[in-house]
Amino acid sequence: MRHRGLGLAALLALLAAVAPRSSAAAGAALWPMPLSVKTSPRLLHLSRDNFSIGYGPSSTAGPTCSLLQEAFRRYHEYIFGFDKRQRRPAKPNSAIELQQLLVTVVLDSECDLFPNITSDESYTLLVKEPVAFLKANRVWGVLRGLETFSQLIYQDSYGTFTVNESDIIDSPRFPHRGILIDTARHFLPVKSILKTLDAMAFNKFNVLHWHIVDDQSFPYQSVTFPELSNKGSYSLSHVYTPNDVHTVIEYARLRGIRVIPEFDSPGHTQSWGKGQKDLLTPCYNEHKQSGTFGPINPILNSTYNFLSQFFKEVSMVFPDHFVHLGGDEVEFQCWESNPEIQGFMKQKGFGKDFRRLESFYLQKLLGIVSTVKKGSIVWQEVFDDHVKLLPGTIVQVWKNQVYTEELREVTAAGFPVILSAPWYLDWISYGQDWRNYYKVDPLHFDGSQEQKKLVIGGEACLWGEFVDATNLTPRLWPRASAVGERLWSPEDITSVGNAYNRLTVHRCRMVRRGISAEPLFTGYCDYEYKT
């Protein structure tokens, strides 16, 4: 029987490449692959009742660190809490039991702080009988090490929790490893966002890029300007209250994840205008107002008064040092049609180059954000249109046409870069497109070593035109996992075949933990997803 969309030869090739059936008995399958892994054939057993996670005697963090206490509870449950299989009769227990994981934080723990771009996520993990040791400079490394430790443990054919003696040294290749979610095209319930944060932690992502508002809706509930969401959201039940936002930020912090909001302007702002009078530019048709509106009006003082107050609030709500300001896809037609803007352009000597007007607006906005002690991230058009950027402004490269050239130009100008162009997960295709994401290397462009140091990482972007809570998780995972390993693991971890074998197991592990990750290909999981 011919498979629709595949020739016989292609189908046979796919079947030949299928991974071993992903079951717990497959042993540990680490994802993302650590920097250095040494494993021994010597096996240790664990039991729920006899195993515990505690602190080493020299640890700077202890039982008062709620972040770690919550993580210990969470990972104990991840390891033992899904043991629902019918077991075979127990075999004679010949292996030595692993009784404890001792965690040591070496430096100031940062237990009550928020993660940032320079947070230390490195750790070492030594698993030997009768006690395993996890050591990290900060709590952020402990979180990453706990995830790795949990992945080392599997159940053998008798259902016994088993781990190989192991010695692991690990740290991330890039400091910025993000997922973009879009809550403007479709509202995503807080529960869905929290589930995404769980999955991000399983894949060692550390940035949630929250594209929170756009043309279609303004669900962010501003205390200073409540009419923005009252009139700009889809409905009053489709908003994120201050408590909702705080819940997301704190849930992320407990998993070592930063939350960076994006308030894109001057374009992508139609929803803003519904609740903020005179913010948008009136468009004209044959010398009369057409009744439609374009980008934010860049020539009014009231615009910048509003932006100053709004971003002052944003700076207090979101603790991360960076705010994403967008700046992409600004359409100039409405500005061109408006006689007041034409007069302003003439007064400023801008001629008919509306990129200079865009630059005028964005430079003022960058200054406002700097005044509230925040750094800025912008989409690549802001750089391409020669806006004068403040030092340290991060440029996010998203256009897929020769993105390597864009990386070269931005880094040559001395600006840090986030790469997203090859990782737009909303562009779905038949088959195993995760392989294409996996093969990308952010540093494969023509540039000096100093330039390549400016590539701080990347993001997998899932835009929301066709995504809501019903398909958010399976569309993200495990496709985003491929990006996660590329951004965490060493440059020489490139074998797609090896990745496939590990990722099928990791996908089942996510399913076991309640993440509805879609399958990579044919096969099964010992713990199938329960709705």
Swiss-Prot record:
Localization in the cell: Lysosome; Cytoplasmic vesicle, Secretory vesicle, Cortical granule
Sites carrying sugar chains: N50, N116, N164, N301
UniProt catalytic activity: Hydrolysis of terminal non-reducing N-acetyl-D-hexosamine residues in N-acetyl-beta-D-hexosaminides; N-acetyl-beta-D-galactosaminyl-(1->4)-beta-D-3-sulfogalactosyl-(1->4)-beta-D-glucosyl-(1<->1')-ceramide + H2O = a beta-D-3-sulfogalactosyl-(1->4)-beta-D-glucosyl-(1<->1')-ceramide + N-acetyl-beta-D-galactosamine; a ganglioside GM2 (d18:1(4E)) + H2O = a ganglioside GM3 (d18:1(4E)) + N-acetyl-beta-D-galactosamine; a ganglioside GM2 + H2O = a ganglioside GM3 + N-acetyl-beta-D-galactosamine
Signal peptide positions (record): 1-24
Record-annotated disulphide pairs: C65-C111, C283-C334, C508-C525
Keywords: Cytoplasmic vesicle, Disulfide bond, Glycoprotein, Glycosidase, Hydrolase, Lipid metabolism, Lysosome, Signal
Activity regulation summary: Addition of GM2A stimulates the hydrolysis of sulfated glycosphingolipid SM2 and the ganglioside GM2.
SUPFAM superfamilies: (Trans)glycosidases, beta-N-acetylhexosaminidase-like domain
Example of a GO MF term: beta-N-acetylhexosaminidase activity
Gene Ontology biological process terms in this record: carbohydrate metabolic process; ganglioside catabolic process; glycosaminoglycan metabolic process; N-glycan processing; single fertilization
Domain of life: Eukaryota
Active site: E329
InterPro entries (UniProt xref): Beta_hexosaminidase_sua/sub (IPR025705), Glyco_hydro_20_cat (IPR015883), Glycoside_hydrolase_SF (IPR017853), Hex-like_dom2 (IPR029018), HEX_eukaryotic_N (IPR029019)
Coiled coil region boundaries: none
Enzyme Commission identifier(s): 3.2.1.52
Stated family: Belongs to the glycosyl hydrolase 20 family.
Disease with which this protein is associated in UniProt: Defects in HEXB are responsible for Sandhoff disease (GM2-gangliosidosis type-II). This disorder is found in Korat cats (initially imported from Thailand).
Subunit structure: There are 3 forms of beta-hexosaminidase: hexosaminidase A is a heterodimer composed of one subunit alpha and one subunit beta (chain A and B); hexosaminidase B is a homodimer of two beta subunits (two chains A and B); hexosaminidase S is a homodimer of two alpha subunits. The composition of the dimer (isozyme A versus isozyme S) has a significant effect on the substrate specificity of the alpha subunit active site.
Protein name: Beta-hexosaminidase subunit beta
